[in-house]
């Protein structure tokens, strides 16, 4: 029994040894993926930096660099250290294995390495990718653990190379990691000295390339006869194209040089390589083959290029002229003709003037650009002249606002008006929402002290009360022009009626006259009000041009609002000298400078005093709003005085006696708003000549003939100071005459 037991134990031990060896080969361990290549190369030069030294082992998944992993990270990983090169022979060529240790900087973020080997004077490049397998994350204790790559084979003897080891993911890119330069050993050191590979081999002293039309002639001095070369091979290709093409050259027996002709090659930069039939001789050069210019190439090419360009240009010019002509016909077809339709429309105007004119108050943002202000002025004049409305606009009533105070005038107009039109824009949306954010605890907004915010919140409160009391909400209208969008309407105005101008112009016209018209009387008013013909009138043409100018401004500067207000840096309010502003039309406008009083501008006590003179519902509105401006008013009062802005800007008239009439006097033959119309800029020359009628002064009631105004000299009002006692001191000065519109 004893010998049997000993034999069984021996067989079990032998089986365990063989099975354990197979499992070890399957697992691989450190450098397991390079085992096959290392065995093929005899296992020479393998590193044992991680073996039998008591350090922690690391395993990697080895592959080439084709599977792309994002190498960009958020942390810095330092350069590897202690780079060593292990060289050995593999299939009668040089093979190397690179060894290194990781840097402690960023080692916890390390996920792998890219090992890039490149010949110093060639374009050849080899790359290996090592992805960390175990452990998943390294700690600083691994900084002394050695790491090694798979063998890089097929290298040349006595050739300069450099290796670059790039850890990833790192915030540094490949170019920020330093290369390690080395030179491969001679053939005699890696192979036996008697090996044929290590014997001296021949290289041609001269390799010349000449161009012969579309052909290249390659000449070189061939090897002596005792070398036994019978053929030479020319490998050539364009620099950035695919594999080499091959041309076989037979050695000339009677000369010392051999020539080969490469026929019908494409012009470009070529790489030419000379190889003998035993593949031991190799010499490379670059040559740029220039294009061939035949005697007829220039004229024929010029004709072939010029004629199509001329034809295309002619068609493009003709198409442009036709489109322009058609556009002019569509827009201005009715401006120069005395048609029966125009006569009927002109005859119908006096009948329309006999009807009650609905009172309209316009509220808008003073924080948008000057082009938007021009649109507001032209829109107000259009409502008054074309739509038969009695318009209240702060730009037309500076003197009255100065006498009554801004908020008193504002509340009065809101209460008196039959309709309140809020022109919504990007600026209104932005600053109204900023005001709401400030009430929720956010930092102070940049729109404090702007009267249009007070107007918007007052209208919103009236809208809310009308909703609660089940009153008619048609008084409140929110409009936006086509250079804005419906999203520019503040959320507090959602209950109002919304119109897009000028697309919904007929609906707005019907809305404004809905209280004065019955179904039987509707034909008295013009029925041809639409987006396509509103510019037939003088006021409509001015509005059309102002909208076009705003479109052109937005096309030139799409981010004009963001540049101006986002982020908006607030600056302390202080009294400043009046600054002259200039509209695009050439009219010089001044802002009205008001002296800050203790009971002025967004102060709750003053609001109560002002509203007590008005209606009782206004009192409730202001108490409910309580715009949170007490702190702001104290800051402003500490600053001394401030600039009180009207809803937009103030337009100054020529003389005190010629000041624009307020909104309560619209029966005159000349509307007061005509003094502030912008010029029709942005049109073509012929369109400007056609539309020059916009410069004439016409009767809003259709009476009288149009005569161009002749302005010889004009007096403009310099900014006055409104004191707390509501006394307005106006100073006049002589200014230079302004050319007529």
Curated annotation (Swiss-Prot):
Residues 357-510 form the SEFIR domain. GO terms for cellular component: membrane. Keywords: Glycoprotein, Membrane, Receptor, Signal, Transmembrane, Transmembrane helix. Residues 323-741 are cytoplasmic. Gene3D superfamilies: 3.40.50.11530. It is found in: Membrane. PROSITE patterns: SEFIR. The keyword Ribonucleoprotein does not apply. Residues 27-301 are extracellular. Residues 688-708 are annotated as: Disordered. Residues 1-26 form the signal peptide. The keyword Membrane applies. Residues 688-703 have a biased composition (Low complexity). Glycans are attached at residues 57, 82, 173, 208, 279. This is Interleukin-17 receptor D. It comes from Gallus gallus (Chicken).
């Amino acid at each position: 029994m004893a010998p049997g037991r000993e034999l069984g134990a021996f067989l079990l031990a032998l089986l365990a040894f063989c099975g354990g060896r197979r499992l070890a080969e399957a697992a691989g361990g450190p450098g397991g993926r390079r085992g096959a290549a290392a065995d093929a190369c005899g296992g020479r030069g393998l590193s044992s930096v991680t073996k039998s030294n008591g350090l922690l082992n690391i395993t990697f998944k080895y592959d080439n660099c084709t599977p792309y992993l994002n190498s960009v990270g958020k942390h810095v990983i330092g350069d590897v250290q202690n780079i060593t090169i292990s060289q050995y022979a593999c299939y009668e060529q040089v093979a190397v294995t690179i060894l290194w240790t990781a840097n402690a900087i960023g080692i916890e973020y390390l996920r792998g390495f890219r090992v890039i080997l490149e010949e110093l004077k060639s374009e050849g490049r080899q790359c290996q990718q090592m992805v960390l397998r175990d452990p998943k994350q390294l700690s600083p204790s691994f900084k002394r653990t050695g790491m090694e790559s798979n063998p890089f084979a097929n290298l040349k003897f006595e050739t300069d190379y450099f290796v670059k080891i790039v850890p990833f993911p790192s915030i540094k890119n490949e170019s920020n990691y330093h290369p390690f330069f080395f030179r491969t050993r001679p053939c005699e050191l890696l192979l036996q000295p008697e090996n044929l590979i290590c014997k001296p081999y021949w290289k041609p002293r001269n390799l010349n390339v000449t161009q012969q039309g579309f052909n290249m002639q390659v000449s070189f001095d061939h090897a002596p006869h005792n070398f036994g070369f019978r053929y030479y091979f020319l490998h050539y290709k364009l620099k950035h194209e695919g594999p080499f093409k091959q041309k076989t050259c037979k050695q000339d027996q009677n000369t010392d040089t051999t020539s080969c002709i490469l026929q019908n090659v494409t012009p470009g930069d070529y790489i030419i390589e000379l190889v003998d039939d035993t593949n031991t001789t190799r010499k490379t050069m670059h040559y740029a083959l220039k294009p061939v210019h035949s005697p007829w190439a220039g004229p024929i090419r010029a004709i072939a290029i010029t004629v199509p360009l001329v034809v295309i240009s002619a068609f493009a010019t003709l198409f442009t002229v036709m489109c322009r002509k058609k556009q002019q016909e569509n827009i201005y077809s009715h401006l120069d003709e005395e048609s029966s339709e125009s006569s009927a429309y002109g005859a119908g105007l006096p009948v329309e003037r006999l009807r009650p004119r609905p009172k309209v108050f316009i509220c808008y943002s003073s924080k948008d650009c000057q082009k938007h202000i021009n649109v507001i002025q032209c829109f107000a004049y259009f409502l008054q002249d074309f739509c038969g409305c009695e318009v209240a606009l702060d730009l037309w009533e500076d003197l009255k606002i100065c006498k009554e105070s801004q908020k008193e005038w504002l509340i009065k107009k809101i209460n008196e008006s039959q309709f309140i039109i809020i022109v919504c824009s990007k600026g209104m949306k932005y600053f109204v929402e900023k005001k709401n954010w400030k009430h929720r605890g956010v930092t102070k907004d940049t729109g404090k002290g702007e009267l249009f915010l007070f107007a918007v919140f007052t209208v919103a409160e009236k809208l809310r009360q009308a909703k609660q009391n089940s009153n008619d909400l048609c008084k409140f209208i929110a409009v936006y022009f086509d250079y804005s969008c419906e999203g520019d309407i503040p959320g507090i105005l959602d209950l109002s009626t919304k119109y897009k101008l000028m697309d919904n112009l007929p609906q707005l016209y019907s809305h404004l006259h809905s209280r004065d018209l019955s179904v039987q009387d509707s034909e008295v008013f013009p029925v041809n009000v639409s987006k396509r013909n509103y510019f037939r009138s003088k006021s409509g043409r001015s509005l059309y041009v102002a909208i076009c100018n705003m479109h052109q401004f937005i096309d030139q500067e799409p981010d004009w609002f963001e540049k101006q207000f986002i982020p908006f840096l607030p600056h302390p309010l202080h009294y400043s000298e009046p600054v002259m502003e200039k509209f695009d039309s050439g009219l010089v406008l001044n802002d009205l400078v008001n002296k800050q009083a203790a009971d002025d501008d967004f102060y709750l006590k003053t609001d109560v005093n002002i509203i007590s003179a008005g209606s009782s519902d206004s009192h409730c509105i202001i108490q409910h709003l309580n715009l949170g401006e007490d702190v702001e008013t104290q800051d402003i009062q500490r600053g001394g005085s401030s600039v009180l802005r009207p809803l937009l800007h103030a337009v100054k008239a020529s003389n005190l006696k010629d000041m624009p009439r307020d909104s309560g006097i619209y029966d005159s033959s000349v509307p007061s708003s005509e003094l502030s119309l912008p010029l029709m800029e942005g049109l073509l020359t012929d369109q400007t000549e056609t539309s020059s009628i916009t410069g004439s002064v016409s009767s809003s009631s259709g009476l009288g003939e149009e005569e161009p105004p002749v302005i010889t000299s004009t007096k403009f009002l310099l900014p006055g100071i409104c004191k707390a006692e509501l006394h307005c001191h106006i100073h006049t000065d002589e200014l230079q005459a302004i050319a007529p519109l």
